[in-house]
């Protein structure tokens, strides 16, 4: 998934969605069981980038969100990626951030990992790192349950990643670094509520197949072991 720029700042986007709900009240605007988010978008932290692969790779990542828990089995076939993401998790880089992108038409992913919630943020001072473990299957490249890195071009990985909740075919350009073990039903519930963008002229929000999740998804904490 390419990194994208949000149409406006997070606070403006969230506030504007009330304008679409009044004219589309028949559509749900929240996922049952989700708590009210409290995080604020912020600039990505500046952290030291790992220069070598961890001698003992983490095996599991647990993402605690305001809507529930997502558990990921980490793939040793992407050792540098797993090392870098584990470093970010241990530094609490992801804590108090939002998943900023949901796609529901043709491509089925929830994208997270940018503290600015604008789709173009990565750790300050980090250089893009190499792609690893690219899909071997050129027909169904990213099946449901896959977790992969977002990037803007080859070898530009940072902190953004996407969770695939339905079978998705994309160019085989995105590092696969994990598989969802628990939490896939939650992602399907998030999909049903949908995504939106904001019209820059009117300021009104509208439903779209590629935008900000209608149900805000806040990452409370990320742990690895």
What are these regions (language model features)?
Residues 2-4, 8, 13-225:
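Cyclophilin-like peptidyl-prolyl cis-trans isomerases
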């Amino acid at each position: 998934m390419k990194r994208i720029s949000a149409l406006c700042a997070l606070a403006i986007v969230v506030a504007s969605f009330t304008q679409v709900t009044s004219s589309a009240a028949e559509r749900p605007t929240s996922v049952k069981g989700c708590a009210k988010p409290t995080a604020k978008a912020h600039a990505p932290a500046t952290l030291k980038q790992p220069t070598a692969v961890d001698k003992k790779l983490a095996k599991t990542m647990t993402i605690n969100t305001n809507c529930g828990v997502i558990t990921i089995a980490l793939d040793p076939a992407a050792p540098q990626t797993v090392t870098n993401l584990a470093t970010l998790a241990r530094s609490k880089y992801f804590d108090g951030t939002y998943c900023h992108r949901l796609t529901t038409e043709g491509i089925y992913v929830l994208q997270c990992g940018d503290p600015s919630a604008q789709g173009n943020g990565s750790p300050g001072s980090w250089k893009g790192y190499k792609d690893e473990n690219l899909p071997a299957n050129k027909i169904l490249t990213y099946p449901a349950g896959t977790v992969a890195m977002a990037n803007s071009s080859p070898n530009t990985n940072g902190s953004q990643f996407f969770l695939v909740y339905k079978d998705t075919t994309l160019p085989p350009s995105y590092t696969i670094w994990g598989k969802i073990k628990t939490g896939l039903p939650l992602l399907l519930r998030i999909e049903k509520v949908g995504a939106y963008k904001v019209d820059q002229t009117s300021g009104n929000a509208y439903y779209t197949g590629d935008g900000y999740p209608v149900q805000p998804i806040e990452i409370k904490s990320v742990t690895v072991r």
